[in-house]
């Protein structure tokens, strides 16, 4: 627990830094020529794409007014350089640190409601030529389509589906150059993680239980994105015995039977505070006293301050890397994680971060 207390004491100090090229008196040596990358295919309109619900969506011209009713697609739009085209955004946007840091103008956009309660009137009044919604808003998407408003449905519940979402939005909005860069970054990091964990035996892969933000007795089934974070990082998801694509309630007996080696507590969905319970609450719960993770003090809380890294947002790759360090610190250090976090945010969101370990 001391190791992770140190990691969880990371001082998340955000530093807005302009990058300047270094100059010198001596001419720089001529580097070897780099291979010329394949050019990104040109997007032409009218354009027809197939969204993640299998529906064909046609756009007569490049979208200039985008509404995102889902924080996951909103974060993706920022990473793809589309924030200036957004004219409507999901509820409670002011609570999301990433918007304040990377695209503060989004906070003042019209509120179009949430994934659970979408405000159709507010969306239509924003006069969008493209709307992006979560899969659970199928009926709303149908209504908007019947009104002549192009609407994409997305469902990023795995690394592969997240890449599919980047490609879908990138293609539809003519931002494939940035989408390709993001996908290549993801794939490079996932390849590196696979290389680091390839020699782990089954016995070296801990059983990991991830709780929800509202209750320790809610966890992620095998089809949820959170499960993929665990397995990719060299662990075994305790919730793989459950079916479904949403947080699932269990009872004490099931939790005790799972007997995880590690327990992970995510930040809240706005990444501004801890969930409704803490690691200490779990460690001090007498009912859980015989659980391996509790006996060994292996109950860890994800960092707070930017985004919920256990969610399928672009920065979800940092959730995988954080999980890798948590489960296998001998393979991937806190210093490596800090460097990767800074690289990610500076590359795709335009600001630097410093994650300095407190003493």
Regions found by a protein language model. Give the residues of each.
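Extracytoplasmic substrate-binding proteins
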Residues: 46-49, 56-58, 140-218, 239-241, ...
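Flexible, glycine-rich surface segments
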Residues: 220-290
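Proline-aspartate-enriched helix->loop->beta-strand connector
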Residues: 112-115, 120-133, 149, 251-268
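Bacterial lipoprotein signal-peptidase II cleavage site
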Residues: 19-33
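A short, structured surface patch at a secondary-structure boundary
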Residues: 68-126, 130-136
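Structural recognition of the beta-strand scaffold that forms the well-ordered cores
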Residues: 65-69, 85-90, 111, 130-134, ...
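Bacterial N-terminal signal peptides that target proteins for export
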Residues: 1-11
């Amino acid at each position: 627990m001391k190791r992770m207390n140190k990691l969880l004491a990371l001082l998340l100090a955000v530093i807005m830094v302009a990058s300047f090229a270094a100059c010198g008196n001596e001419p720089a040596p001529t580097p070897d020529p780099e291979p010329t990358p394949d050019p990104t295919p040109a997007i032409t309109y009218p354009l027809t794409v197939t969204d993640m619900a299998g529906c064909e969506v046609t756009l007569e011209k490049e979208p200039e007014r985008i509404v995102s009713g889902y924080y996951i697609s909103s974060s993706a739009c920022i990473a793809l350089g589309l924030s200036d085209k957004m004219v409507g955004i999901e509820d409670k946007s002011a609570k999301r640190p990433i918007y304040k840091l990377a695209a503060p103008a989004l906070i003042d956009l019209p509120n179009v409601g949430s994934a659970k309660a979408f405000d159709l009137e507010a969306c239509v009044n924003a006069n969008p030529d493209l709307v992006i919604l979560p899969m659970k808003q199928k009926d709303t998407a149908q209504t908007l389509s019947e009104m002549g408003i192009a609407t994409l449905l997305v469902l990023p519940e795995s690394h592969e589906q997240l890449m599919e979402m980047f490609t879908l939005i990138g293609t539809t909005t003519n931002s494939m150059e940035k989408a390709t860069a993001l996908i290549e970054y993801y794939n490079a990091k996932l390849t590196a993680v696979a290389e680091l964990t390839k020699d782990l035996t089954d016995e070296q892969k801990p059983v990991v239980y991830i709780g929800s933000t509202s209750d320790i007795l809610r966890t992620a089934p095998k089809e949820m994105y959170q499960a993929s974070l665990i397995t990719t990082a060299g662990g075994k998801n305790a919730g793989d015995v459950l079916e479904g694509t949403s947080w699932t309630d269990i009872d004490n007996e099931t939790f005790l039977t799972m007997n995880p080696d590690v327990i992970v507590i995510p930040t809240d969905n706005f990444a501004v505070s801890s969930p409704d319970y803490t690691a200490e609450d779990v460690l001090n719960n007498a009912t859980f006293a015989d659980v391996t993770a509790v006996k060994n003090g292996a109950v860890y809380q994800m960092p707070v301050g930017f985004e919920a890294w256990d969610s399928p947002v672009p920065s979800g790759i940092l959730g995988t890397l954080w999980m890798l360090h948590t489960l296998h610190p001998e393979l991937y250090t806190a210093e490596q994680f800090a460097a990767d976090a800074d690289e990610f945010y500076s590359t795709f969101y335009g600001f630097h971060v410093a994650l300095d370990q407190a003493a």
